[in-house]
């Protein structure tokens, strides 16, 4: 697929961002392109708003897979680009439009240049939430099309085009959404002694939560608790009877995640006693760590370097969350960062990755699959 075609597809997809499990236009756009290929070369199955695509090998004995996430974010785009989002309040601010386009470029190559083994492509919805990887793994499709290896990438705005970065073992952290509700007795601002102020309770809790990191977490380990939103109260002269907190937890080990959650729940119990209120802690969405398979990852890095397909760098662990971790929990494989050189980072309303990165990615994966699927 020519570079100009990749860019045109990416811009089409960029115009129609949709959030998790609502990617109806996106799915249809992808199907319209995929259905143009000969039926003897590819097989297509849909799953909710996602798609499975099998590119048939000439004498298959195994199956290599590639996953591309397809959802967008609830962000009002501020790029001013001529192909900016046509859906107010939504934007491809995490590069999934490029991820999909790269997958299409790889598919196009192998439809026209068959290899021995089957290739499976997963267009996965809802990576940003509520999480599409884990339920997609339960699909009946993967009972008949079972990967022997699975791969994925994610754009990295901070890396130059022509660069990839990854490592064996832990790449991305365990992540969990955090929601806390505090319910007490409201009242008149002039009579605080007759009420239980949930704004004060929430404020106290937020500061206490940081002690879980500073005093309960091994200094040689890493963990993060971020409270991103607090809502409570209805007017300036009414003591709030309810407070709602939302945030995230990120850790580099499952053991740390269990410890952090246990301490959060203990601190909430303390708030219940101290402020005569009721507290509720929930974790709406939890993502397993991305843990690259040793051996396969080094082999991939060496292959890309030896064939000068990209500048290969060794990555550091990141506190980023990615539900591709569930796929790596089930199948061997790896994920890597793709340099996309943007002055604005992921989840930013002005993210504008360099489209030349797509050609690098297609060349890397075409080269890798051409060797290891033959």
Curated annotation (Swiss-Prot):
InterPro entries: AcetylDAP_deacetylase (IPR023905), Amidohydrolase (IPR017439), Bact_exopeptidase_dim_dom (IPR036264), Peptidase_M20 (IPR002933), Peptidase_M20_dimer (IPR011650). It is an enzyme of class 3 (hydrolase). Disulfide bonds: none annotated. Its EC number is 3.5.1.47. NCBIfam families: amidohydrolases (TIGR01891). Pathway: Amino-acid biosynthesis; L-lysine biosynthesis via DAP pathway; LL-2,6-diaminopimelate from (S)-tetrahydrodipicolinate (acetylase route): step 3/3. GO terms for molecular function: N-acetyldiaminopimelate deacetylase activity. It comes from Bacillus velezensis (strain DSM 23117 / BGSC 10A6 / LMG 26770 / FZB42). Belongs to the peptidase M20A family. N-acetyldiaminopimelate deacetylase subfamily. Coiled coil: none annotated. Gene3D superfamilies: 3.30.70.360, Zn peptidases (3.40.630.10). The active site is at 69, 128 (proton acceptor). Catalyzes the conversion of N-acetyl-diaminopimelate to diaminopimelate and acetate. One of its GO terms (biological process) is lysine biosynthetic process via diaminopimelate. Keywords: Amino-acid biosynthesis, Diaminopimelate biosynthesis, Hydrolase, Lysine biosynthesis. This is N-acetyldiaminopimelate deacetylase. It comes from the Bacteria. It catalyses: N-acetyl-(2S,6S)-2,6-diaminopimelate + H2O = (2S,6S)-2,6-diaminopimelate + acetate.
